[in-house]
Amino acid sequence: FKAIFLAGGPGSGKSYIASKTAGGHGFKVLNSDKAFEYLMKQAGMSLDMTKMSPEEEAAKDVIRDRAKEMTAVQKKAWCQGKLGQVIDGTGRRYDKILKLRKQYEEMGYDTYMIFVNTSLESTIEWNKKRERKVKEDILIPAWQDVQNNLGKFQQLFGNKDFVIVDNTPDIEKGTEGATPQDLDAIWNVITKDFAVRPIRNPKAKAWIETEKGVCSIERAPERVTDQYGSPSERPAIPGWRQAEMEKERKGK
């Protein structure tokens, strides 16, 4: 009943940050990009989307739709199992996150957000180095949209359920992004403030109480003796069946 939303521009290092912070808590990572990359490789297509022909663009769009379908099936199964999840997205569309967060909360989930912040310059450089490259005319507007949503996300999730990770390289310190100390701090915040805290969502609490009630109805088998006087077990007879048996006995 815990869901962590990731937000950050393409190439900001969200997946890396998630693996180093939330991953150790057993959260399942929901990311259509993983399925997309797998299907692209299966189709023998390059992940460098800066050099695609119109025909390749069309094929890529079909594969993208298939990846989304696969991820939706995965999400449904994990939600049915009430499993903790990391929703790995860019956060470019505020309305999409707003709707998705509401869906999870309607299912009983507590929600949290990790916002991975980077400078535009470092985002462009990382995009050049990674296998799945995005065109800059898509990358730059996406980065700007995410930055514009920062304040909205902070207000939506609240200070207690929102954390910012600065993953911008520091030339003076010689770091390529968030330091091990930064990641340790985020790990501690997630552990203390979210992953292990008691569930707050009333819907989840009600579901848990219902499950407890179902379990309490199941009585232990009765200890009886067989025809030879030896101890044996038989399933407990439900109350409604006992009443019927009593009526049958009196009717004879």
Segments from the language model and where they lie:
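Short hydrophobic/aromatic beta-strand immediately N-terminal to the Walker A/P-loop
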Residues: 4-5
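The conserved Walker
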Residues: 9-10
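Conserved glycine(s) of the Walker
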Residues: 13
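Conserved substrate/cofactor phosphate-moiety recognition/catalytic segment
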Residues: 16-84, 95
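Hydrophobic anchor at the start of a short beta-strand
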Residues: 27, 85, 111, 160-162
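Conserved nucleotide-binding/hydrolysis micro-motifs of P-loop NTPases
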Residues: 34-36, 92-93, 117-122, 169-172
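Conserved phosphate-donor/acceptor-positioning beta-strand/loop module used by diverse small-molecule
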Residues: 92, 105-126
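Conserved GTP-binding G-domain of TRAFAC-class P-loop NTPases and closely related GTPase folds
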Residues: 120-251
